[in-house]
């Protein structure tokens, strides 16, 4: 169970829950398997009505810089009736490091401010560690869980699911190690 503070100064929602290419191709919002980043953020936006809100997510593609997650997320939030004028949509970042850095530059958090970061559970450590390295303490709000709290070893013959989990896990471990070696974080665990 996630225990949240009564008041926070800001929410940082990491991109990665939309598919900008398909959204543009079919002229409708296209969400992916990390949609919980958007869905759960709605609850926090409604709970913390005075908080600053930054959605961070650019393109990640050098060839298609206008295919950014922030633009599609803004459309999503508008469609469900949230006031997007009170939100900041950062659309230049291309990776988690830039998500946190650019958001910090926008937020300009004071020392005692409380900020919550919303991202997938498998991705949370990287976001938190980048914040730590840049003197920004973030409270984690993990979503998009792929495993139960209590690990139970059992034979699972669902090959596609197993490959997907292995890909996600290896991607994050490589990312944690690479960011540590590049000096973007101070630790990997």
Predicted regions and their residues:
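A transmembrane-helix-recognition feature enriched in membrane-embedded lipid enzymes
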Residues: 166-188
């Amino acid at each position: 169970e996630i225990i949240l503070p009564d008041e926070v100064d800001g929410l940082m929602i990491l991109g990665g829950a939309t598919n900008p290419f398909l959204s543009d191709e079919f002229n409708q919002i296209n969400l992916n398997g990390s949609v919980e980043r958007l869905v759960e953020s709605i609850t926090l936006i409604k709970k913390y009505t005075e908080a600053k809100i930054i959605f961070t997510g650019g393109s990640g593609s050098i060839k298609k810089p206008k295919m950014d997650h922030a633009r599609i997320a803004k459309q999503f939030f508008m469609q469900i009736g949230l006031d997007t004028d009170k939100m900041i949509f950062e659309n230049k970042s291309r990776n988690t490091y830039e998500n946190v850095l650019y958001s910090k530059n926008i937020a300009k958090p004071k020392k005692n401010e409380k900020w919550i970061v919303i991202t997938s559970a498998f991705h949370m450590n990287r976001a938190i560690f980048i914040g730590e390295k840049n003197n920004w303490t973030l409270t984690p709000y993990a979503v998009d869980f792929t495993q139960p709290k209590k690990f139970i070893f059992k034979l699972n013959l669902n090959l596609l699911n197993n490959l997907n989990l292995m890909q996600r896990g290896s991607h994050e471990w490589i990312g944690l190690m690479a960011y540590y070696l590049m000096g973007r974080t101070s630790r990997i665990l």
